[in-house]
Amino acid sequence: MAAKKKILLVSATIGKNYELAQELKEIIDNTTAVDTAVINLVSYDLPLYKPGIETKNETASELSSEFENADGFIFCAPEYNGGLPPILTNAFTWISVTTANWRDGFKNKYAVIATSSAGSGQRFLVSFRSQLEYMGTLVMPKTITVTNGQSLKRKSAERTLHNLTHLLSK
């Protein structure tokens, strides 16, 4: 029997995006047989990565292991100054320098991008898609967006998550 696939839900905040990650986890857990885990990047308390510093960091290695052991991802993060939140960029940098090959945590894995932002989050969604694809991640075409004026469209989210879990089961 094949091992169960694992989706890692990654939140870049302890607020609304963490709540969104928990809600998306609940949808997956209630509709599929895929294993899920939610992590909050804030809890890792990674130091700011600076080129030339020692890359042997136990916390970063633990985070890298989480990424390497996942089959797919759901990233929940807000738009921050028209792009990615710094905590997400910092985490990705640490992952890329603590794996054997800098893309090992990302390549050939599927991902859904989700955002809970004050506005549309479009600048984040576009720039993050580009970064994930560069890292070798296969990003689902449909995103999940929650704004101050629009709550989660549950049926739409269920379809998007179903498509992700369907691809993982192949």
Give the location of each predicted region.
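Helix-loop-strand module that forms the ligand-binding subsite of alpha/beta enzymes
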Residues: 58-135
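A short, structured active-site edge motif that brings together acidic residues
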Residues: 40-43, 105, 109-110, 143-148
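Cofactor-binding loop segments of dinucleotide-utilizing enzymes, especially the Rossmann-like FAD-
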Residues: 12-14, 41, 116
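Glycine-rich phosphate/pyrophosphate-binding loop and the adjoining helix
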Residues: 1-3, 32, 138-170
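Short helix-capping segments at alpha-helix termini
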Residues: 29-34, 104, 136
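Generic structural signal for residues in well-ordered beta-strands
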Residues: 36-38
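N-terminal beta-loop-helix "entrance" segment that forms/cooperates
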Residues: 41-58
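N-terminal beta1-alpha1 ligand-phosphate binding loop
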Residues: 2-32
